[in-house]
Amino acid sequence: MHYMKSSTNNAAGRKSIVLVASTSGYFGGTGVSAYVSSKHAIIGLLRGSHVAAQKHGITVTGIAPFFTYTNITAKAGTRWQADGLKPNTTDDVGLAIAQSSVEGASGSCTLVCCLSHPLNLSKLTV
């Protein structure tokens, strides 16, 4: 935020920070306390910084993806899919970041979870 509030290098006139949390930042549930704690901290940073950022014309938003399939989560992803659940893809998360950077209301966080329906991307603002 320090750089952005003094930067004039912004042709569109919009300054935006998107924080990546997790649904674990709201609901816990993974059983990995360090991960859950770090994601709760990101939600706290979002809540604590967006008011100060607005004073400088900076929008601070967040996204909170549900389970996302990556190389690190491949083993769990296989079990997830075997149970008939559809994990997010990195493309789903990337799209949510891009949308949040241009459409998000400061202080908002978007849950990103793929469900078995025609849209494949369900976003709920919390």
Regions found by a protein language model. Name each.
Residues 1, 46-47, 94-97:
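Short-chain dehydrogenase/reductase
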